[in-house]
């Protein structure tokens, strides 16, 4: 009987007509526009049409069993169909994994375009229709029976296919629903198989109607997602670039979020059934919550965001949280992240939107323990004396001495600039004068905060950075030695802001012990860098004398301080012309 029927599958590109219209005009589905591709994650509604060959209603040419109207009507009303989907047409692709960039997140030139890393999709699904109980189910409809054909409205979801699947194989199984025999209901198949031979038990089912129809359709992947992470003034920022690279149709971005991936915090289940947490990885009791990443508003960040073919859009996120870690927090906390993009196209007749989850690079929260901040009033007028307040928050260790040294001439050190760029930078450096370039703040205990005011004067208009050239010198060890041979009085003709005098004073102050200085100048790639608070190890003077003053607790002697524990925050001032 199966060979006496024709089977056709229709995938309409528009919503299906109401059931009453299909029943009144069964051939209406032929006029509907068809789809030649599907989207991974969507829920697809389609029609399976089973048509009897040779005209069942005429009673001729139908063959045994289907040659009469009554036989066809009896079979058509007893048929049922079920659809399933599987991956077909080759192995799944990489899902964007091949776009991964070897450049670590946060490093390099902020203006570079090659720092975006490809993010591979993990899961793609659609919301589907929700029942009153909140569960997502697929609708099941009875077939529409006409004179010579049966129409099965079917629904299948493409959210269980692996990411990167190129084609979907949709299989529909059609069978005749039989009334279960009374002996089977009373005794069950197990008891019947124990008392009868299997051939006798299933002989009646061998003649039942069974057919299977399948087709292959192209699957379009979700939008491409690329990520770039960097840190500015201690704030963790993430830029997500969404690109419509695979569809010629317009897609709309309805929402995009960044969430911590708590599932990545757990090790595989142990043999005894216990689960362990990974060290230094954020988990549900950690510091980063589901709402820690906030999308920053932009000029074109309203939803929905349309993307035509090969168009892209950037979204900026900031990790909100305290700069100082709470008590008992782990140092160097690693936060695995995922991005969730809600998108849709006009060619989704049944699915309102699709949700795609992407794997993002992890964020490492290396919170500095020694932070220098600066603040001043802005704007100021030219030739007006203004004060910059520097605050040092020390949660690292005890220091014997802390000094601030204004060193604008070091800004060009190690940089290869053309003559025009050199003149422009020199003009900018000469625009701000520091009245007190050498500042000794004394000792600093762990857990304390030092505040110091430095006077400046601007000679030209413009926007100037006042924390970049303020070098921070920290003395952290002491040792007995001979006094420095060059500790002689300064000449009256020497300016206190000249490099020669500052170098002499620094060597004289080096007699207090071993020190280390930090600035915002760009270090070489061999140095350890912390994105957003880039620092450079300038000099380490050997211990030459013992300090005089209040005794402090000092940790064991170290060659250098860890650069990721010290940070400087920028401070800019706007200089304008005086009001006449």
From Swiss-Prot:
Q: Which residues carry this modification: Phosphoserine?
A: 491, 517, 546
Q: Can you supply a Gene Ontology BP term from the record?
A: regulation of cell population proliferation
Bias-annotated ranges (Polar residues)? 512-525
Tissue-level expression: Broadly expressed. High levels in brain, cerebellum, testis and whole blood.
- Which superkingdom is the protein from? Eukaryota
Which keywords annotate this record?
A: Cilium biogenesis/degradation, Cytoplasm, Cytoskeleton, Disease variant, Phosphoprotein, Primary microcephaly
Biased-composition ranges, Gly residues, are 105-116
Tell me where it mainly resides: cytoplasm
Give the Gene Ontology MF terms in alphabetical order.
alpha-tubulin binding
Biased composition annotated in UniProt, kind: Low complexity: 124-137, 492-502
Its quaternary organisation is: Component of the multisubunit TRAPP II complex, which includes at least TRAPPC1, TRAPPC2, TRAPPC2L, TRAPPC3, TRAPPC4, TRAPPC5, TRAPPC6A/B, TRAPPC9, TRAPPC10 and TRAPPC14. TRAPPC9, TRAPPC10 and TRAPPC14 are specific subunits of the TRAPP II complex. Interacts with alpha-tubulin during mitosis. Interacts with RAB3IP (via the N-terminal region); this interaction mediates RAB3IP association with the TRAPP II complex. Interacts with TRAPPC10. Interacts with FBF1.
Please state the pathology the record ties to this protein: Microcephaly 25, primary, autosomal recessive: A form of microcephaly, a disease defined as a head circumference more than 3 standard deviations below the age, sex and ethnically matched mean. Brain weight is markedly reduced and the cerebral cortex is disproportionately small. MCPH25 patients additionally manifest global developmental delay, severe intellectual disability with speech impairment, attention deficit-hyperactivity disorder, and reduced white matter and thin corpus callosum on brain imaging.
What function does this protein fulfil? Specific subunit of the TRAPP (transport protein particle) II complex, a highly conserved vesicle tethering complex that functions in late Golgi trafficking as a membrane tether. TRAPP II complex also has GEF activity toward RAB1A. TRAPPC14 is dispensable for TRAPPII complex integrity but mediates RAB3IP preciliary vesicle trafficking to the mother centriole during ciliogenesis. Modulates YAP1 activity as transcriptional regulator.
Which protein, by its recorded name, is this?
A: Trafficking protein particle complex subunit 14
Q: Which organism is it from?
A: Homo sapiens (Human)
| Gene that produces this protein | TRAPPC14
């Amino acid at each position: 009987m199966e060979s006496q029927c024709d089977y056709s599958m229709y995938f309409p590109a528009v919503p299906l007509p109401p059931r009453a219209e299909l029943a009144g005009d069964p051939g209406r589905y032929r006029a509907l526009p068809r789809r030649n591709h599907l989207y991974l994650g969507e829920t697809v509604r389609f029609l399976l049409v089973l048509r009897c060959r040779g005209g069942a209603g005429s009673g001729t040419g139908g063959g045994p069993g289907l040659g009469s109207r009554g036989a066809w009507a009896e079979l058509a009303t007893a048929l049922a169909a079920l659809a399933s989907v599987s991956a077909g047409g080759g192995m799944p692709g990489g899902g964007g994994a091949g776009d991964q960039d070897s450049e670590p997140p946060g490093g390099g030139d902020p203006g570079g375009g090659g720092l975006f890393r490809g993010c591979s999709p993990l899961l793609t699904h659609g919301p589907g229709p929700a029942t009153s109980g909140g569960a997502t189910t697929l609708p099941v409809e009875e077939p529409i029976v006409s004179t010579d054909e049966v129409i099965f409205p079917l629904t299948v979801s493409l959210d269980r296919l692996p990411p990167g699947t190129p084609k979907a194989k949709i299989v529909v199984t059609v069978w005749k629903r039989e009334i279960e025999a009374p002996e089977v209901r009373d005794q069950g198949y197990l008891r019947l198989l124990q008392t009868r031979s299997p051939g006798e038990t299933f002989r009646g089912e061998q003649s039942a109607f069974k057919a299977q129809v399948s087709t292959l359709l192209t699957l379009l992947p979700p939008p491409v997602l690329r990520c770039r992470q960097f840190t500015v003034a201690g704030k963790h920022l993430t830029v997500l670039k969404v690109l419509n690279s695979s569809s010629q149709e317009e897609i709309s971005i309805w929402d995009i979020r960044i969430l911590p991936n708590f599932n990545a915090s757990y090790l595989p289940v142990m043999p005894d059934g216990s689960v362990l947490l990974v060290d230094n990885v954020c988990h549900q009791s950690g510091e980063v919550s589901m709402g820690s990443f906030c999308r920053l508003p932009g000029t074109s960040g309203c939803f929905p965001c349309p993307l035509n073919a090969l168009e892209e859009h950037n979204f900026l996120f900031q990790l909100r949280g305290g700069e100082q870690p709470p008590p008992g927090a782990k140092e160097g906390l690693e936060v695995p992240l995922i991005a969730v993009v809600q998108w849709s196209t006009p060619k989704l007749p049944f699915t309102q939107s699709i949700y795609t989850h992407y794997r993002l690079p992890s964020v490492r929260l290396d919170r500095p323990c020694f932070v220098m901040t600066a603040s001043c009033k802005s704007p100021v007028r030219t030739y007006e004396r203004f004060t910059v307040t520097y605050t040092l928050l020390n949660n690292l260790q005890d220091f014997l001495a802390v000094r601030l040294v204004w060193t604008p001439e070091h800004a060009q050190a190690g940089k290869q600039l053309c003559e025009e760029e050199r003149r422009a930078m020199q003009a900018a450096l000469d625009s701000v004068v520091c009245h007190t370039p050498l500042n000794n703040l004394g000792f600093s205990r762990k857990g304390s905060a030092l505040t110091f005011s430095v006077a400046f004067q601007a000679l030209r208009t413009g926007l100037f950075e006042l924390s970049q050239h303020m070098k921070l010198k920290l003395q952290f060890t002491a040792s007995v030695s001979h006094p420095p041979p060059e500790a002689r009085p300064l000449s009256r003709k020497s300016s206190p802001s000249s490099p020669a005098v500052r170098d002499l004073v620094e060597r004289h102050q080096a007699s207090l012990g071993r020190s280390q200085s930090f600035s915002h100048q760009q270090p070489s790639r061999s140095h350890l860098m912390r994105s957003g608070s880039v620092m450079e190890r300038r000099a380490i003077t050997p211990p030459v004398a013992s300090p005089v003053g209040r005794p402090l607790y000092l940790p064991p002697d170290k060659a250098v301080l860890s650069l990721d524990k010290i940070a400087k925050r920028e401070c800019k001032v706007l200089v304008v012309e005086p009001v006449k």
